[in-house]
């Protein structure tokens, strides 16, 4: 008899199908209220990618609206993956430094190995400039890099949604909610 694993995570086939396009999207926006399993679903997806693709996974947990703490978390995530490109870099305060950082990130992350950067609890940051930066970055990312942002609130400016076009994958509460057959 098979031993039950009480810590096993159940992800329905329908939700798995919803997650699959992340592999082909530069930016995936996961927006749903608390309790819909955003983090659980993305962590399951990333664990699958690590096992099947040997992907590089960069996780950034956002704890507050403090940009300094956010930036330190980003630097720590890169450092934990052995990527030192952001060590000593300041948070980009203007368009020129943001563009330079985008170029540097694309250069460092480009390659054959799939790379997933997951920003969790983005709603806590409450910074429109960071949202615009992420959209600009998504428009430049090499094909092997995928940005995933989970938030309780919509964070994408309408004009950026249009600019991103097919590079954007959106997952909402309708896709995450379990139905009566699941």
Q: What role is predicted for each listed range?
A:
Residues 5-19:
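N-terminal pre-P-loop "Q-motif" helix
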Residues 27-29, 55-57, 114-116, 146:
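Residue-level preference for the first positions of well-ordered beta-strands
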Residues 26-43:
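Walker A/P-loop nucleotide-binding motif
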Residues 41-44, 50-114, 124-126:
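Conserved phosphate-binding/catalytic loops and adjacent sensor/switch elements of nucleotide-binding enzymes
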Residues 19-25:
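Phosphate-binding P-loop
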Residues 99-153:
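Conserved Walker B catalytic segment
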Residues 40-44, 132-182:
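Alpha-helical sensor/transducer elements of the RecA-like P-loop NTPase core
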């Amino acid at each position: 008899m098979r031993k039950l694993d009480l810590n096993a995570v159940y992800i329905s086939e329908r939700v798995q199908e919803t997650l699959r396009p992340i592999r082909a999207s530069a930016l995936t926006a996961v927006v749903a209220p608390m309790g819909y399993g955003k983090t659980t679903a993305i962590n399951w997806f990333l664990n699958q990618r690590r096992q099947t693709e040997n992907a590089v996974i960069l996780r950034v947990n956002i704890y507050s609206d403090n940009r300094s703490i956010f930036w330190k978390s980003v630097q720590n995530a890169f450092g934990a993956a052995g990527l030192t490109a952001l060590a000593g870099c300041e948070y980009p305060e203007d368009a020129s430094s943001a563009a330079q950082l985008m170029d540097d990130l694309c250069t460092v992350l480009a390659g054959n190995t799939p790379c997933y950067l997951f920003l969790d609890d983005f709603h806590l940051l409450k910074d429109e400039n960071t949202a615009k930066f992420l959209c600009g970055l998504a428009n430049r990312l090499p094909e092997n890099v995928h940005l995933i942002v989970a938030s309780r609130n919509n964070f994408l400016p309408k004009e950026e949604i249009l600019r991103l076009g097919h590079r954007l994958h959106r997952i909402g509460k309708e896709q995450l909610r379990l139905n009566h057959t699941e």
